């Protein structure tokens, strides 16, 4: 079996639960056809660079799978027929990256709010004279 990564975009008017239901549905399709989902991530609603089917935003989902090509083709066929799925991208990879995807790492950094460049400021004595008003 081969390793694949899939990203799909669902319509923006779906609820989060419905979007995650789509992830579960397509994972089941892979499993029914002899494959397995190694990892799945729901990236949330993101703004797209251009409109797709009159939608400016969409629910993004990411799947890592280990499946035969027939299972992947069947899942892609069903995704393209599904009214709620706007775009599908599947790539074959040599191996899956460990840990969360780059998108999830970015989200974690953003939610944490921890700025690494703030701890070394101290009392900000490195600013020097800023040409303040003097009499």
Curated annotation (Swiss-Prot):
| Xref: NCBIfam families | S6
Q: Which Pfam families match?
A: Ribosomal_S6
**Gene of this entry:** rpsF
GO terms under cellular component: cytosolic small ribosomal subunit
**Sorted UniProt keywords:** Ribonucleoprotein, Ribosomal protein, RNA-binding, rRNA-binding
PANTHER family this protein is in? Answer: MITOCHONDRIAL 28S RIBOSOMAL PROTEIN S6, SMALL RIBOSOMAL SUBUNIT PROTEIN BS6M
Q: What is this protein called?
A: Small ribosomal subunit protein bS6
Q: Name one GO molecular function term.
A: small ribosomal subunit rRNA binding
**BP GO terms, sorted:** translation
Q: Which family does it belong to?
A: Belongs to the bacterial ribosomal protein bS6 family.
